[in-house]
Structures are given as C-alpha cells and as structure tokens.
C-alpha cells in the first residue's frame, strides 16, 4: 500500500482509504466458512456476491442468512475499525472514509428494514445510529477528526437495505456526525437509469445540519457537478465508475476529451481485467 500512497503523493495528490465491513453481504466461502454477521438475522434478498473458493468455478452466488451480532461482536468490530484507521495512516494514507452506505454492515444497522433488534442498537433512529457513532468516535480518537470522512446512501436500496423514513433518518445522521467534527460527509445519490432526484429539501436540511465539507456523488458529469457546487448544494462532487474506464478523468474533464465507457460485468469480481487495464486518452 505504501507504494500506492507514495505514488499519489509524488503527483501532488491526497488519498483516503475507504474502510468497510460488508456484514451480511458475503458468503461463508469468503470468510473461512464462518456465518456472516449483521445487525439482525435477516438475509439480504436477491443479492449475490463473488466467491473463489479454489474448488468451484469462480462466480457469483446467493448470500446466506447472517447471525445477529452480540454486544461483544459489536465491541470487536468497533475495535477493528479503530485499528484499521491506524493501519491506513501508517500505510501513508492521508485519512480514511468510513463506508456506511450501499447496504454494508453499518448501513445494516442504520436502515430500519434491515434492523429488527430490540436492544439499544435497534428501534428508534437514535438507536440505529448508535453503532455508526461508536465506530466514528473510535476512529476520531485514533487518528483525529480531520482525517475521518463518512459515506452515506440515504435513498438507495443497494444490497437489500431500505429505510422507511430516509429523510428523517439521514438528516439525523448528518446532525449526529456533525458532533464528531469529521472532515467531510460523502452522500451517494441513487444513480440507476430513471432514478428520482434527491429531494432538494433533504439537501438543504443536510447542509444546515452538517458544517463540514459536503460531497455528493451519483450520475454527475462535469456540467451537473459545476452547477451543484455553484448553487451551494455541495462543496465537492465525487466520481466513481467514470474513473474506472478513465484513469485520467480530471484531464478529460478539463480538456473536454470524450469519456470511455466501463464494462459493468467486471466491476465487482475477478482480477485486473476491466478494473486497472483501461488506457489514458490517446487522442
């Protein structure tokens, strides 16, 4: 990893490591035969994950039902996040982004339809945000708030997570994260074809609740991104999939070069093909 961070710094860049625990979005073959863990023993419906167990043909299979995390499990995972943050800084990263979105473990606590716990980690919005807060607090204490960002996905249903009242839940999450003075909040918008726009009232509420740097990502191009920043909705715009097929994306945007399409079939499994083998623009 130090080779990567050194290379980024040599080019004058800043690099954060995105830290995530997938929770129930995995398979026993990927974790030494153990049963996956989650906020609750609720299987993610219609979700497949990539496995390569050395015996069967590598490919995508259905996830299994997870087991509900105990209090000791929760403490252990909080500690794992704390140590992961320290490891990232030691490896030369400038900071970390806590991936609390896209249906992964922390999102499985936040969203009401994935969390049916009856203890202090389930039920009310405050309770469902508790695990998020404990992880953030541990990482802030370990490496400093100015090195911690958080990614949320309020309106997606990725990997089977859905919240009954996303506006209320995620406005509360923004205000909660503001208490920890994290450096930024990164919000992933829904970005499938014909996806609805994120409500403007929600964006205004998040802007009011969170005083750090705001980043939005999802279906943005250079024009939409510039407009969002100019309107004060966000401070920065993130690009994900366009970067996969366009390793020189900033230059392509700056000079108006055409963007190469990515292959969606190679995004979530396999090796280098379709992930790190796209060329820079050659004219």
Q: What are the residue ranges of the model-derived segments?
A:
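Flavin-dependent oxidoreductase catalytic cores
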Residues: 1-283
């Amino acid at each position: 990893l130090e080779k990567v961070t050194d290379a980024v710094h040599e080019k004058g860049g800043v690099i954060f490591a995105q830290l995530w625990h997938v929770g129930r979005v995995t398979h026993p073959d990927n974790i030494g035969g153990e049963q996956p863990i989650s906020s609750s023993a609720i299987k993610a419906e219609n979700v497949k994950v990539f496995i390569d167990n050395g015996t069967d043909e590598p490919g995508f299979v259905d996830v299994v039902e997870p087991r509900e995390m105990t209090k000791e499990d929760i403490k252990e995972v909080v500690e794992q996040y704390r140590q992961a943050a320290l490891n990232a800084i030691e490896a030369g990263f400038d900071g970390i982004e806590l991936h609390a979105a896209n249906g992964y473990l922390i999102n499985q606590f936040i969203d009401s339809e994935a969390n049916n716990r009856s203890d202090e980690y389930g039920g009310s919005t405050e309770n469902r945000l508790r695990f998020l807060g404990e992880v953030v607090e541990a990482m802030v204490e370990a490496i400093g708030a100015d090195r911690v960002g958080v990614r949320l996905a309020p309106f997606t249903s990725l990997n089977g997570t859905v919240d009954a009242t996303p506006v209320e839940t995620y406005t509360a999450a923004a205000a909660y994260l503001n208490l920890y003075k994290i450096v930024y909040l990164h919000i992933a918008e829904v970005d499938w074809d014909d996806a609805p726009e994120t409500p403007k009232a929600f964006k205004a509420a998040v802007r009011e609740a969170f005083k750090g740097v705001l980043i939005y990502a999802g279906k943005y191009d250079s024009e939409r991104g510039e407009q969002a920043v100019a309107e004060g909705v966000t401070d920065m715009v993130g690009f994900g999939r366009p970067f996969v097929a366009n390793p020189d994306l900033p230059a392509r945007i700056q000079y108006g070069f055409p963007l190469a399409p990515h292959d969606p079939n190679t995004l979530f499994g396999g090796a280098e093909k379709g992930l790190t083998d796209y060329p820079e623009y050659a004219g």
